[in-house]
């Protein structure tokens, strides 16, 4: 990685990093210049361990940390473990997500035909998960008296909605608004907060969509860059926002979505 994207020795914590976008973000941050190491979180610890092992084998520094981000006590334990192993968290990437619905729109039930347990889980991971993680790292981040970075991965569904994704869309929109307020509050402490908005990306969760040629033909007509995103596309932006290069950027929402916004 170029030295212009220097991490300033900051320790990073990436949630939902056992595969897909989160895993690639963790790898990017670990391999960046002057990285302080990465805590790889996932609900499924074996996934986090596999990513951490890959980072360590490549010469980086990483640990695996299990947590359910919707549970405040679980998150606080995760942050404590990270601090003990690597040091105070200087970069938080909120990537953990739960769509709470089938990947194919036609297979999704109307939200009123689902149950409160599904609603609570979807809101818990996508909205309260961000609140829990930000709340757990901020006290230590402020005590560092050094630049800090908070980044949340948000979906285009938060801005434009999606068929059968009402609860998910609302939760992600709430998280985006929360981040903007965090940016206002934390600017005086040299801590920035930004959102990255993503659309259809090649991950294990989207394979049913990506493997349907007819569906993909219609979908790609809505993108200026006519291909699905790759995890590295999002990780590149996350690395920039986590690095010293972004110190005067805060409270912003960046679409990394192949021009989906303009094609609507």
What are these regions (language model features)?
Residues 155:
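Residue(s) in the substrate-gating loop at a strand-loop-helix junction
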Residues 2-4, 160, 239, 250-264:
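Short C-terminal tail/terminal secondary-structure segment
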Residues 103-120, 219:
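Substrate-binding pocket helix/loop in short-chain dehydrogenase/reductase
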Residues 187, 192, 249-251:
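Short, small/polar-rich loop/turn modules that mediate ligand/substrate recognition or access, typified
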Residues 134, 171, 179:
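Active-site helix of classical SDR
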Residues 139, 184-185, 247:
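Alpha-helical segment proximal to the catalytic Tyr-Lys
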């Amino acid at each position: 990685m170029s030295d212009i994207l220097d991490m300033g020795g900051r320790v990073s914590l990436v949630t939902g990093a056992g595969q897909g976008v989160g895993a690639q973000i963790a790898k990017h941050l670990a391999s960046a210049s002057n990285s302080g190491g990465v805590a790889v979180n996932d609900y499924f610890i074996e996934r986090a361990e596999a990513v951490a092992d890959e980072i360590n084998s490549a010469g980086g520094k990483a640990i695996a940390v299990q947590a359910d981000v919707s549970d405040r006590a679980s998150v606080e334990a995760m942050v404590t473990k990270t601090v003990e192993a690597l040091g105070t968290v200087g970069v938080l990437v909120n990537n953990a997500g739960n769509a709470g619905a089938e990947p194919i729109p036609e297979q999704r039930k109307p939200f009123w035909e689902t149950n409160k347990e599904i609603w609570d889980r979807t809101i818990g991971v996508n909205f309260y998960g961000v609140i829990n993680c930000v709340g757990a790292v901020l006290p230590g981040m402020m005590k560092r008296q050094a630049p800090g970075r908070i980044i949340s991965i948000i979906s285009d569904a938060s801005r434009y909605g999606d068929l059968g994704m009402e609860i998910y869309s609302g939760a992600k929109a709430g998280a985006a608004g929360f981040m903007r307020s965090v940016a206002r509050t934390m600017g005086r402490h040299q801590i920035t907060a930004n959102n990255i908005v993503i659309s259809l990306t090649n991950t294990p969760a989207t394979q049913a969509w990506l493997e349907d040629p007819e569906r993909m033909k219609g979908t790609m007509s809505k993108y200026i860059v006519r291909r699905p995103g790759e995890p590295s596309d999002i990780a590149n932006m996350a690395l920039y926002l986590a690095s010293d290069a972004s110190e005067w950027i805060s409270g912003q929402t960046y679409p990394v979505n192949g021009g989906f916004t303009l094609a609507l």
